[in-house]
Amino acid sequence: MKKIQLFLLQFLLISITQHTNAQLPVKTEYTVEMGGTSGKGTYAPMWLTANRQGLSSANTENGYLRAGIAHTMPLNQHFGFSAGLDLATAYNFTSSFIIQQAYADLSYRWLNLSIGSKERLPELKNSKLSSGGMVESNNARPIPQIRLEVPDYVAIPGPHKWLHLKGHIAYGRFTDDKWQEHFTSIGNPYTIDVLYHSKSLFAKVGNKEHFPVEFEGGIQMSAQFGGDQYIAGQKEPVIDMPTRFVDFMRVLVPMAGDDTTPEGEQVNIYGNHVGSWNFAATAYLNRWKVKIYYEHYFDDHSQMFFQYGRWKDGHIGLEITFPKNRFIDTFVYEGLGTKDQTGPMLYDSFWGKFEEQISAKDNYYNHYLYQGWQHWGMGIGNPLLPGPIYNKNGQITFISNRVLAHHIGFCGSPCQSLSYRMLLSYSRHWGTYDNPLNEIKKQFNSLFEVTYAPQQLKGWSFTVSGAMDRGNLLGNNYGGMLVIRKQGIIKSGNK
């Protein structure tokens, strides 16, 4: 892990010294949006809620009004600045006023420093059609953070520029303290003042101008740390996690906690860490583009490498981009498996009589101290593992993380002003190893969406969506959604 961190630092230095920043025009853009959902059932259909950057609601009747502004400008040949503010007021959401985005970015050549809350998309996947990333997707609200990043691939000097790198390091804070206090039922735990950390390093090998196949691969890791755990109904915290400088280092380079942390942190790693290895190969075949990808999720060291043999859990995908036609633009198929989790047994020699360690029963997305890998009730990872927002028992956990699922998404543009999108998902759920469901639950989720952007009304778009859930996990739900959006440029030109 230390070698990965040193390599990332060297890469950032290379990106600063070897590349120049493109001169961007001064631009100020605005967006005003209104959306409403109406449905029948226990919840709003999943695909009317999932992968919408957390600006959504599981309630059958809900709506929002949103307004945002973004400004971009160059400071000189190498420096650039951008900032944005995106606010919403909502009905039947987890909060009635939402600061969706509030950020300021300072870029130097290809290096970017981002401060604040900003919407981001999963790595290597089609955010419009994919079911989402395993570690972080676009399912939950953005987490405010300080982020040092190379957001786009940077070519490393060499013949034909075959090697490209990108990556980031970030620290932030979760913002759902009040929601957790309100949602958690008496006697159940919740944790507030929780801090956030993430990092990634990705490489791309190839140059499609010289060879029609490119390969991508990388690692991303995120963590929850710090914070105070409470039991609902009690005033004093039961666990107070330290947040000293050394603790920030312990999540940067994952290490065990000291005697100021609970025993679980001393035996394992300080904080709740999640991560994944990501691989993709993209072929450019005349006017076709075909990508295959694989994301291997790990919740601890047992699945980070090959300690317990071959990887059995993962997220595989196929994405096909078609030559321009009226019927279909892009097709995505994905298969998801999280059922193994290294096996059903966990044994820590710290508390036992035997020296052997069995690091299984990984319990994806759940944690004894931070409850779940979630923000405002929505899972930060893949939404096919439903988040705590769906729990009736007032617990901030994932009730089913052992899942096998298939997912299909496709979209098209029959004409210049009309486009469509369709999502179809089928999943089977076993619950968790500790709390298995009394039977295998099956769930089907679907979405059909049409967007009309009339040429005579520049900047306006109207999106109508219909969705349906059928099954015995989330139930049978039906609903429709209407979104009206106006986008435009307030100012544009050279500095």
Task: Annotate each language-model stretch with its function.
Residues 1-26, 492-495:
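Bacterial Sec-dependent N-terminal signal peptides
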Residues 3-4, 213-223, 228-495:
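Exposed, low-structure sequence patches enriched in small/polar residues
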Residues 20-120, 127-130, 134-153, 161-165, ...:
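Beta-barrel outer-membrane channel/assembly domains of diderm bacteria
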Residues 23-28, 71-82, 94, 107-111, ...:
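Short loop/turn motifs that connect adjacent beta-strands in outer-membrane beta-barrel proteins
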Residues 28-41, 81-89, 106, 113-119, ...:
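Transmembrane beta-barrel strands of outer-membrane/channel proteins
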Residues 37-39, 86-92, 118-134, 155, ...:
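Sequence/structural signature of outer-membrane beta-barrel proteins
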Residues 50-53, 86, 129-132, 182-187, ...:
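Extracytoplasmic loops and strand-loop junctions of Gram-negative outer membrane beta-barrel proteins
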Residues 121-234:
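Internal, well-ordered domain-core segments that constitute the primary functional module
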